[in-house]
Design a protein with these regions (language model features):
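Short, solvent-exposed amphipathic alpha-helical segments in soluble enzyme
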Residues: 39-41, 101-103, 193-201, 286-289, ...
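C-terminal catalytic subdomain
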Residues: 297-409
């Protein structure tokens, strides 16, 4: 008989809106350690997960052997759980780490809890048990995250959310499909994607889509839907500069066509060859459409940057919010000036209607509508990151700084980032020699460590 009994805890809060998480508790067939402490830790751990807004599945019956593990996994799969958290309140059977690795291909989050405070006997060896499991999973080449701490500790809860987001990101990538309309922009060969390397490394599939067929789709969007969308654009309150409201219709068509295509093809992300065909054939750049879609939480990239769209998808899945996909325009040793011609997510710009708010304008080069001109917000923590392919492998990097007021103003979207520790001259040179493409992503948070941990989880080579 198990020495871990059913765990009574309060019902989850707002269960209808919660994300289902598999929470398995490793029990013991033989009595041992401090089972009162074990039970208390289980109750507090599950309650902490529920307080964080997760709907926990599987915690009510302990995992004792292969048979109970199979039953537990059937339940969590039926509930659609993307992430699996393994609790080991007292040290259990290490052999089950390999059984779980065989049955659950996605990353596993191991949570080790503290010993009972005070003198006397060892109460649980929870950290020792999870150390054992982690070592075995690594030697089996199975990705995992390890969290250690008390259920009531704020830092522990933050680590749990991060670890579960990382695990679900890897799981989502394995089942994701990214669409690419056309190819990379002319000459931008550094953005070329390898569909089979993507499948082998990240698990996702690349779906090639016809640019001429997309143009036909843009032209055939229902007029009533276009009129409704133009009203939605007006409500954004964006100023007009060298454009008129007559220019809004074509970009609404692009916006609706991209949304329609993503829905029809079940795409988790989309990138588009935005020039030269679109400005020449439909008369506009689709950049307002991209700025709106990214602000709404869709992973959409320009110039055929497949890896850029994938990185956007990763960031959103990790809970990092939207990213600005941009050129690295210039730098000195402590600052980098990022610029692109007008498709930054609207929520990363200053508020519409304000002094520095964005406006709708014409592209600086092929002088046609419709781009979003506007600085991005300064005074914010910032991370600059990139995922890329080189030498038949994937690589990733990220580093942190802070956005500061720009030294000069350009059309398009710009932001000046200061890196306190400097070293950007050497960093840029090293990154180019590592094959990093000319686009990077910028997030409004310090999240370099989240990128490092995701790279480790995915088996992607990390560049510090």
């Amino acid at each position: 008989m198990s020495s871990v009994t059913e765990v009574p805890v309060a019902a989850p809060k707002s269960a209808g809106t919660q994300r289902n998480i598999a929470v398995l508790i490793l029990g013991r067939k033989r009595p041992g350690f401090d089972q009162e402490w074990n039970k208390l830790v289980c109750q507090r751990s599950v309650a902490a997960m529920q307080d964080l807004g997760f709907h926990c599945v599987g915690y009510d019956l302990p995992v004792l052997d292969d048979a109970t593990l199979r039953v537990a996994l059937e339940r969590v799969r039926a509930a659609g759980c993307e992430s699996l958290l393994m609790l080991q309140p007292s040290m259990g059977n290490g052999q089950l780490a390999l059984s779980l690795s065989q049955a659950w291909p996605d990353p596993i989050v191991l949570w080790a809890t503290p010993e009972r405070p005070g003198d006397g006997k060892v109460s649980s060896c929870s950290l020792v048990g999870q150390h054992l499991w982690g070592s075995m999973l690594r030697q089996a080449n199975h990705p995992f995250e390890l969290v250690y701490g008390d259920p009531g500790d704020a830092a522990t809860r933050t680590s749990l959310v991060q670890a579960l987001n990382l695990a679900s990101t890897a799981a989502r990538l394995r089942n994701a499909k990214i669409g690419v309309i056309g190819s990379y922009a002319p000459g931008f060969i550094d953005l070329a994607a390898d569909p089979f390397l993507l499948r082998r490394t990240l698990g996702l599939q690349l779906h090639a889509l016809s640019l001429p067929q997309f143009i036909d789709r843009v032209k055939s969007i229902d007029e009533a839907a276009v009129r409704r969308d133009i009203e939605a654009v007006r409500e954004l309150g964006l100023r007009l500069k060298d454009v008129t409201e007559d220019d809004l219709g074509v970009n609404s068509r692009c916006y609706l066509a991209m949304r329609q295509l993503m829905q029809e093809e079940s795409l988790a992300g989309l990138c588009i060859q935005c020039w030269p065909e679109l400005p020449e054939v439909i008369g506009q750049w689709p950049y307002l459409a991209i700025a709106r879609l990214t602000a709404e939480g869709h992973a959409v990239a320009m110039e055929g940057d497949v890896d850029g769209a994938i990185a956007e998808l990763m960031g959103r899945s990790m809970g990092l919010g939207n990213a600005f996909l941009t050129d690295w325009l210039e730098h000195d040793d402590k600052t980098v000036f990022l610029w692109h011609p007008g498709m930054a997510p609207l929520d990363m710009c200053y508020a519409a209607g304000g002094q520095n708010g964005p406006c709708l304008a014409r592209h600086f080069n092929i002088v046609k509508p419709l781009v979003v001109d506007g600085e991005l917000r300064s005074g914010q923590p910032v991370t600059i990151a990139r995922l890329w392919r080189c030498d038949n492998e994937y690589r990733m990097t990220a580093f942190e700084g802070r956005s500061i007021p720009p030294r000069r103003r350009l059309t398009g979207n710009t932001i000046l980032v200061e890196v306190e520790r400097g070293g950007l001259m050497r960093r840029f040179d090293d990154l180019v020699h590592e094959g990093m493409p000319h686009h990077v992503l910028m997030y409004y948070s310090h999240c370099a460590d989240a990128h490092r941990r995701l790279a480790r989880m995915l088996g992607v080579r990390w560049f510090e």
